Curated annotation (Swiss-Prot):
Name this polypeptide is given: Octanoyltransferase
Lineage of the organism: Bacteria, Pseudomonadati, Pseudomonadota, Gammaproteobacteria, Enterobacterales
Function: Catalyzes the transfer of endogenously produced octanoic acid from octanoyl-acyl-carrier-protein onto the lipoyl domains of lipoate-dependent enzymes. Lipoyl-ACP can also act as a substrate although octanoyl-ACP is likely to be the physiological substrate.
BP terms from Gene Ontology: protein modification process
EC assignment: 2.3.1.181
Predominant location category: cytoplasm
Source species: Erwinia tasmaniensis (strain DSM 17950 / CFBP 7177 / CIP 109463 / NCPPB 4357 / Et1/99)
Compartment list: Cytoplasm
Residues annotated as binding substrate: R71, G72, G73, Q74, V75, T76, Y77, H78, S138, L139, G140, G151, L152, A153
CDD domains: LipB
GO molecular function, one term: lipoyl(octanoyl) transferase activity
Stored Pfam families: LplA-B_cat
Amino acid sequence: MSPDTLIIRQLGLQPWAPVSLAMHQFTDQRNDETPDEIWLVEHLPVFTQGQAGKSEHLLMPGDIPVMQSDRGGQVTYHGPGQQVMYVMINLKRRRVGVRQLVTAIEQTVVDTLAAFSVSANARSDAPGVYVDGKKICSLGLRIRQGCSFHGLALNVDMDLSPFQRINPCGYAGLEMTQLTQQHPGATLAAVQPLLIAHFAHHLAITDIDWREDPSLPFSSLRH
């Protein structure tokens, strides 16, 4: 397989911790010839604290677990009906800068939402993607040895109420929205191919290999 191939793994609904561990192991073990990967996954309910996370932004987590993450940013929520897209790209090999990658991810979401006739925008003062001032997509990355990991979380068709237990991304009173509030009937299955197509376009990637095996043991994901 060519190192230029982009492998897409559809992992279905998974707990956060094992996926995070596998993502770190993939990143630590990859080499210059390892193809880039994107993992599409939904997570069971969890709050994750980024590297800059402050405890005061966790208002009342209640019965939802709080996990520490090494991504950038503050606290956010993951749950069923939210499309998480982990982006593991060798930036050096693809000659992509960090700012260029962030812009590509944000524009990927904007373009995907436009396919549902939803007008969205990124903001320079607050990373992510917004619809009428409400946040619809969170973004958090880390770069290690020239390779990215972590990624985006796009609210599609989920229970948004857990966001009220936190200051999302560290912003008190930040309102959240989701695609089905803007375009009823939207599904993760409809969103996934659009995210991949737009992301590949923005990074000029033409060789894409889709893998669909939600029961795939995480040890098999390691290179």
